[in-house]
Amino acid sequence: MTDTYNSISNFIENELTALLSSDDYLMDDLAGELPNEVCRLLKAQVIEKRKDAMSRGKQDLLSKEIYDNESELRASQSQQIMELVGDIPKYSLGSELRNRVEGEPQSTSIERLIEDVLKLPQMEVADEEEVEVENDLKVLSEYSNLRKDLILKCQALQIGESKLSDILSQTNSINSLTTSIKEASEDDDISEYFATYNGKLVVALEEMKLLLEEAVKTFGNSPEKREKIKKILSELKK
């Protein structure tokens, strides 16, 4: 931060030099009312007093006070960023989010995280003529890119979360079907069931068709029942 302090000190010194070199306004109100020699002596004393009030030591104190205030402001802004982001270490953020998906206790809210990221302050370089402006612009660029990247990733997590309930529902249906098949076949290996499923289904439908054809002959005296059975048969043949 030496460059920042030197910039402040040089600015104060230049401003004071310009002020002291422009003394035309001194004693203007008394011009013509006092002898010229008296005005000259008074002007010299005023300049001397002003120089003493703005001595190098006092300039240094003023520069240090301004520098400390700026450092305090930067520290305050950094603290604000830390408070808004939260106290989650960056290396554990992924674990926190995974725990939430897996149903474990979690302390991270995606919505809260996005809200905090959006609250990160917009920061700008106060004086583009400072010596450190190039480095400051680089830091601000990295900060802005990080903020944008965080927002995009959080939004991607939101989209994924919205699809999670559908995926879990489908998974539960598959698990329920698998359990039912295992109970019916009394075999933990269900690959055989799926391999022979189509063949067994065709056989079952053929048997049903034969039974229905027999039923048509049985209900010969009931045109209404016979028509219903024929309709079922026509559907099976499609």
From Swiss-Prot:
<comment type="similarity">
    <text>Belongs to the NKP1 family.</text>
</comment>
<protein>
    <recommendedName>
        <fullName>Inner kinetochore subunit NKP1</fullName>
    </recommendedName>
</protein>
<keyword id="KW-0158">Chromosome</keyword>
<dbReference type="GO" id="GO:0051321">
    <property type="term" value="P:meiotic cell cycle"/>
</dbReference>
<keyword id="KW-0137">Centromere</keyword>
<dbReference type="GO" id="GO:0000776">
    <property type="term" value="C:kinetochore"/>
</dbReference>
<keyword id="KW-0131">Cell cycle</keyword>
<keyword id="KW-0539">Nucleus</keyword>
<keyword id="KW-0498">Mitosis</keyword>
<dbReference type="GO" id="GO:0005634">
    <property type="term" value="C:nucleus"/>
</dbReference>
<keyword id="KW-0597">Phosphoprotein</keyword>
<comment type="subunit">
    <text>Component of the inner kinetochore constitutive centromere-associated network (CCAN) (also known as central kinetochore CTF19 complex in yeast), which is composed of at least AME1, CHL4, CNN1, CTF3, CTF19, IML3, MCM16, MCM21, MCM22, MHF1, MHF2, MIF2, NKP1, NKP2, OKP1 and WIP1. NKP1 interacts directly with OKP1 and AME1.</text>
</comment>
<keyword id="KW-0995">Kinetochore</keyword>
<dbReference type="GO" id="GO:0008608">
    <property type="term" value="P:attachment of spindle microtubules to kinetochore"/>
</dbReference>
<comment type="function">
    <text>Component of the kinetochore, a multiprotein complex that assembles on centromeric DNA and attaches chromosomes to spindle microtubules, mediating chromosome segregation and sister chromatid segregation during meiosis and mitosis. Component of the inner kinetochore constitutive centromere-associated network (CCAN), which serves as a structural platform for outer kinetochore assembly.</text>
</comment>
<dbReference type="GO" id="GO:0051301">
    <property type="term" value="P:cell division"/>
</dbReference>
<keyword id="KW-0469">Meiosis</keyword>
<feature type="modified residue" description="Phosphoserine">
    <location>
        <position position="222"/>
    </location>
</feature>
<keyword id="KW-0132">Cell division</keyword>
